[in-house]
UniProtKB/Swiss-Prot annotation:
Catalyzes the condensation of isopentenyl diphosphate (IPP) with allylic pyrophosphates generating different type of terpenoids. This is Isoprenyl transferase. Coiled coil: none annotated. Substrate binds at G34, N35, R36, R37, W38, H51, S79, T80, E81, R86, R208, R214, M215, S216. PANTHER family: DEHYDRODOLICHYL DIPHOSPHATE SYNTHASE COMPLEX SUBUNIT DHDDS, DEHYDRODOLICHYL DIPHOSPHATE SYNTHASE FAMILY MEMBER. It comes from Streptomyces fradiae (Streptomyces roseoflavus). GO terms for biological process: polyprenol biosynthetic process. It holds the Pfam family Prenyltransf. Binds 2 magnesium ions per subunit. It is an enzyme of class 2 (transferase). Belongs to the UPP synthase family.
Amino acid sequence: MRTADLFYALYARRLRRQTAAGPLPKHIGLIMDGNRRWARQMGMANPSIGHRYGAEHVESVLSWCETAGIKHVTVFVCSTENLQRRGDTEVSFLMQVIEQVVAVHLARPDARWQVRIAGTLDXPCADSTAHALKEAVEATRRCTTGSQVTLAIGYGGRQEVIDAVRELLHEQAAAGTTLEDLAASLTMDDITRHLYTAGQPDPDLVIRTSGEQRMSNFLLWQSAYSELYFCEAYWPAFREIDFLRALRSYAARQRRYGA
């Protein structure tokens, strides 16, 4: 073993001991940013190739979460804005990558993670991509031993709230509730139970890679009281020690939930 590898292993072991004392987040949100910039840094002719490396890296990070005992992970794969603003060639390549990675690593009979989807698949995603994602959800439905992994694809936080309100209005109209009665009785829980992530706990910790310090329309409602951690590494270069440092930072904080 090289000296650098030895020091890395020893440091990672030390971080694991530090984080084991907790507290640890029950739900982590991951904004996996920087695929294209990483590809440029690595000298790749086509920066979009970074999406493949980034997608392949998800399984490693999920394994770290599983080892740490994190039961819920939400991964921001691509936003509605990404799909609308990127060129057709890049979006098509991204859809192919998603299909292949989901099929190989997630939609398996021996799947370790239960897959859920947050977002709107039918409009922004290719038909084959939407089909692959729905198959992954169905194939892992009975997997209850590992973490629950939510893939936010074709996702926008503002649109999620709009869709939740719209669904609530339809539900209450069907029940015969007037707008006046609904306005008088409306609660945050009413909105929450109609979100894409209904039934899941809010994220305790949101990690964003690439050094950017913003939420980019990710889980806006759910992350109201989340702790935020920004890492300089690009997503494909995000290491286990970076992940463990995020957990260590979280454990050292005193959560105030807005107080």
